[in-house]
Amino acid sequence: MDVMDSFSEVEMPNDISSEDHLLKVIESSAEEVDIFLENCSSLYNLILDSLHNLTSKTISCECLDEMTSTLEKSAKKILAERPEAENSVLLRLNTICCAMDQLRVQHNSRMMSGADSDTASSARSSTSSSTGEMRLWLHEVERRLEINEKRIRVEPNLQLLLSDQQALQLEIQHEGQLLVNRLNKQIKDDHDSDSSEEEKRKTCVDAIRKRWHTIYLNSLSLVCRIEELINHQQASEDSESDPDLVGPPIKRARIRTVGHLTASDTEESEADEEDRHSQTETVVTEDDNVLPFAENEYESIMDGRVTVDSCTSSSEDQMVEQSTNKKWESVLQDVGYSSGENSIHEALNTCADHLVPETSDMRRKRIECSPVKAFYRTVQLEDMSDLEVTKAINHDVEEEPNLSDSMYVNHDSTFLATQNLPEYDEVMALMDDDDLPMDMSMTESFNTKWREIHGQKKPLRRASRPSREQMNLIAKSSCDASSEDSSEGENQTNLEDDPEMMSVSFNSAQFDTSSPLKRQRSARGLKNASFLYDSLEMDGSFCSTRSEMLPPCKTRSLARRKLRVRRMPRSMSDGEQLGVVSSKPEGMMTPMIRVSPPSTPVRRLLRKLDEQIRNRDSDTAPEHSDAAQAYEWDEYNPPQKDDSISDRHIQTMTDISDQLMNIDDDFAEHFGTSSAIRLIEESKSHLRVVLKALEESDSNIPQLSNFELIARSNLRQVDEALKIQSGNQPSFLETSTLQDLRSEWANLYESIRSPFARIMHQVKKFAATLQEVSSMASLGDVDIRSKEDVAKTLDAVTAIERRLSSERQELRDLLASSSFRDVAKDLSCEFESVSEGYDDAVDKIGKMAHSLSQVKGEWDAWNSRQNDIRNAMVRIESHLKEGQMDNKMIADEMELCQERMNSLETMCNYLTASLGSIQNESNSKNLPDFKAELSIYSNALARLKDRFNDMIRVPTPPTVQFHPPEPLPSLARSMTTQTAEMESETENEPLTIAEAISSSRLIKFTFALSLLAALAAIFYYHVFGKPFGPHVTYVNGPPPV
């Protein structure tokens, strides 16, 4: 009790301190959240003030963007520490982001809607800001691409990386397109008078667009790389999980049971198994030995002649009593492969002669007593052996041999002890028949010296993974089962004609039996390149793509499994079916593939075939696991080769040139008449397509390059077909057809490669351009009615000018090239005249573009001058309405308006003359009426002058004023003009001094003030004795005289 008290006293402060620390952390995080919310509120108020112009101090958008980014960083930190505050934090961030977007839109609209004099500068600033934004976005995207490229090496989940990269790809596509469209729109709206500055901005935008295209392509290639990695990983997983690629299945060895199985024996066997399982570190659970029926109803498959306890037949009881003193002994085991290769061994076994007699009634009753007979009929022994739990036998039986493990269990068939098995007889007949036609490779495989296979005497249980000791024991008692398998590829050519022989063994139903003793062979074909040429044509079309010619991922994995060597051959004669065959007398063992032209689908296809053939032609089988392979070398004595065959082979192969590629023996067999006919038809169709395209007049230089590549590829394919036909199968294809096709392709290839074709194409292009330029009078048919029409016409003429300039440079380069001097030496004079025609056309188009640009500039000046006159007249009228009678200012404004009217009249005359010279006489009637607009402004200015003169007119005295009769309305304008002239004459007459003094009150008031000042000075002098004004006072007396 004291110990617990002391323990609690010691541990309590630590708990308290930890709780205090936790509370401090929570409080600090809560304070951070409060500070973040306050910052959000402050920033939102600043954004709203800037948005509605509520503050005298303006804050730039860049500063607000920096503050927003700082808040986003702090938000990420807070979310990492306190996830429960996610809703409030994200809500405020979204609100601030929306407000910032509105502020940016308003800022951009203000920049775009500036004063007319600042339009160019504002457009340039907006363009520079947009380009800066585009560059920042490009930097960010490049950084994210580099991060994804680094993640390829370390990212375990490639699917997640692929989804991230696809999202980035969509962002690059959409965001980049929006930004580039914005830049193009700004440049289109900005019409700068400085052409060099405009060209610089267009060059900058083009560079940014190219950079965006490069980033887009890099992102797309990264997506393809990730997809290829995923496909490769999936294919490797499929190949690792394929049971055909691992070693042969471990057969369960026979066991023998002597007498009654006691409890001690059972315990010893279980102890041995536990030790073995512990050594191999294999865990076997109870679910591994689960049967779909009860344990007491189970009947061992290996013991087909032992009765079940539930069977009460008297005949079977009698049989058990007669066999009480007999024992079980081990027999020869079949640990080979379940493909029929050990049928000879079973045929030599005579254990079937010693079977215990059994009647059909006894067998039928025993089967009826078993509740699992249907299960046995449908499940193979290899599948059941993993679930088998041996049952204790309560009696001893006579030593009897067992059948092989590699069989189907079929209890419904009758079996008589006196009956000889026809399967064995057929096998022995096949072995003894000397007249049986066999291939040389088949006879070679029968020269193997077979060993006997001794079964294991120790009871074993099949685990989920065999141990190394088990593999060693099985390897000692096994034979080299690869002899028949190795020669299987050579015999397969004879077996292909009989599909029934391909799918079943010798002991099949065709020998009138219902109990096959061997499992059916798997329907695997030849281990050669036949399936490659069925799915992937070597002579693939030039129009095909990589995705069309290459098989999908699953098919590629299957192809890799079939090409991989599964068993180790005893010698290189057994490895002949692998395809490593020399096609020369020297015996080169390395396969070579002729390289096709670059950047063609044929080259990629040949490269893949080369890799697959190299994997197939390996001499040794790859190790699929760390466990030792249960293979064994045995003695092999091949028969002496026939020299006549080799001599014929050498004579045939020596006819082939040294430049021929070494190919597989089966290629000529699979490249038969059907494949050759298909190659010829496709090549002819390609030839027709290319010839038809060449006949068209609009074929350009890139198309000629493509045609050259197509011709070279087809020519190479026809050459290879001729070489194969002449080397292996002299009679399977007519040589004349291929030679004629080759000559046609060769002529076409030479005609395309010759520089004369390119020169003629350029000549046609130059002639078409000059013909188009000669009809440039069609520009006069354009109906120009507005400034937009002038801009469109100017763009069209500028594009034509650029095209002519580029083609003129191409023509000059062509005339200066050596190929032209060699081919068209006599036509140099004609080409010189064409070059002069280009110079004249460029000069004419340049002058037309210059005149159109001047018209456009004058039209812009016309519009701006109209705006200036309109604004000045509105100002003058507003002053007159407000009563501000500053006559001098108004007169200056009137004079300025008159000068602008004179310049506007000059512009009107120039625009009318220029547009009339550009257009035809028929369209000159539809020109804009500039004189009508000029008369409108002139009349408005005249009315404004009359109004000003009426307001500043001086009235005459009433005594002198003469009242004329009431004027008629038609004479109102003339009377106003006469009154203004009289006033001007009156104002111009000189006045005398007396009349001026008498008429001016200001002069009178000034004179009165001067008199009063003089009187005040006299009064001051008389009172103080000093004159009025400043005086000098001597300190030490007056100076000496």
Curated annotation (Swiss-Prot):
Phenotype of the disrupted gene, per the record: Viable, but with failed nuclear migrations in hyp7 hypodermal precursor cells. Hyp7 nuclei are mislocalized to the dorsal cord of L1 stage larvae.
Effect of P1038A: Localizes normally to the nuclear envelope of hyp7 hypodermal precursor cells, however hyp7 hypodermal precursor cells exhibit failed nuclear migration
Function: Cargo-specific adapter that is involved in nuclear migration during development and thereafter. Component of the unc-83-unc-84 LINC (LInker of Nucleoskeleton and Cytoskeleton) complex where it interacts with unc-84 to form a bridge connecting the nuclear envelope to the cytoskeleton which allows for nuclear transport along microtubules. Within the complex, connects the nuclear envelope to the microtubule cytoskeleton through the kinesin-1 light chain protein klc-2 (most likely within the Kinesin 1 motor complex) to regulate nuclear migrations.
Domain of life: Eukaryota
Main subcellular localisation: nucleus
GO MF annotation list: dynein light chain binding
Membrane topology according to the record: Single-pass type IV membrane protein
Organism (species): Caenorhabditis elegans
Positions with biased composition (Basic and acidic residues): 613-626
Coiled-coil stretches: 785-816, 931-951
Protein's name according to its UniProt entry: Nuclear migration protein unc-83
Transmembrane segments: 1005-1024
Subcellular location: Nucleus membrane; Nucleus outer membrane
Domain observations: The KASH domain, which contains a transmembrane domain, mediates nuclear envelope targeting.
Segments for region (Disordered): 258-283, 453-498, 613-646
Tissues in which the UniProt entry reports expression: Predominantly expressed in migratory nuclei. Expressed in a variety of cell-types, including cells around the pharynx and in the uterus.
Quaternary structure, from the entry: Component of the unc-83-unc-84 LINC complex which contains at least unc-83 and unc-84. Within the unc-83-unc-84 LINC complex interacts with unc-84 (via C-terminus); the interaction is probably required to recruit unc-83 to the nuclear envelope where it then recruits dynein and kinesin-1 complexes to regulate nuclear migration. Interacts with bicd-1 and dlc-1. Interacts with nud-2 (via C-terminus); the interaction is direct, and is required for recruitment of nud-2 to the nuclear envelope. Interacts with klc-2; the interaction is direct.
